[in-house]
């Protein structure tokens, strides 16, 4: 299924198709990359688009699927470590990722007894499986840059019964970067 998550009709068609094909929902993973533009380049329309993809779509799709949640269902939202720290010119992305992190704990309370809702905030994740060495790896307390399996393993865990007592949490998977203070000439 392909479509623009910012389009309400696409979300409604997707939800209809899921229920038609499967009848119930065990796990929802919201993982969309909204537009990444900053204050110098991002238009009003682009900023709103980023929020529609990154926050409104997960909210609305969850709303559409709530009546079909199976017992023990889990919802995992993918946020970003940028929900707690920033780089210049990333306001649209940062706002959307901060929004999904806040939506996570709100939904966890509203959906109590129906689904567990958590989010993951990845840090630097190399999707090309490049082996980074030197300063790129050294600055990471974990000693390496993350890879998609680091995130996938947490998603699988949060969707499993083993995580049955975890809800409303935002788990940062960034190799410890948000816990480390870096000053000029530290690395």
Where do the model's predicted regions map?
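Active-site helix of classical SDR
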Residues: 62, 96, 104
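Substrate-binding pocket helix/loop in short-chain dehydrogenase/reductase
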Residues: 38-51, 136
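C-terminal helical subdomain
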Residues: 119-120, 134-166, 173-175
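Alpha-helical segment proximal to the catalytic Tyr-Lys
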Residues: 67, 108-113, 164
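Conserved NAD(P)H cofactor-binding loop of Rossmann-fold oxidoreductase domains
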Residues: 31-36, 176
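Short C-terminal tail/terminal secondary-structure segment
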Residues: 167-187
């Amino acid at each position: 299924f392909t479509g623009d998550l910012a389009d309400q009709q696409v979300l409604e068609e997707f939800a209809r198709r899921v229920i038609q094909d499967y009848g119930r929902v065990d796990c929802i993973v919201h993982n969309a990359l909204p537009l990444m533009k900053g204050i110098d380049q991002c238009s009003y329309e682009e900023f709103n688009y980023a929020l529609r993809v990154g926050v409104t779509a997960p909210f609305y799709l969850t709303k559409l699927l709530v009546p079909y949640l199976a017992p023990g269902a889990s919802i995992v939202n993918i946020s970003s470590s940028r929900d707690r720290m920033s780089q210049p010119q990333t306001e649209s992305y940062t706002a959307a990722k901060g929004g999904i992190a806040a939506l996570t704990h709100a939904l966890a309370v509203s959906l109590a007894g129906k689904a567990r809702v958590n989010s993951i905030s990845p840090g630097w994740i190399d999707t090309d499986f490049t082996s980074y060495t030197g300063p790129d790896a050294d600055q990471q307390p974990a000693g390496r840059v993350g890879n998609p399996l680091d995130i996938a393993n947490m998603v699988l865990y949060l969707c499993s019964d083993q995580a049955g007592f975890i809800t409303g949490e935002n788990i940062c998977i960034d190799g410890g970067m948000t816990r480390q203070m870096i000053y000029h000439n530290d690395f």
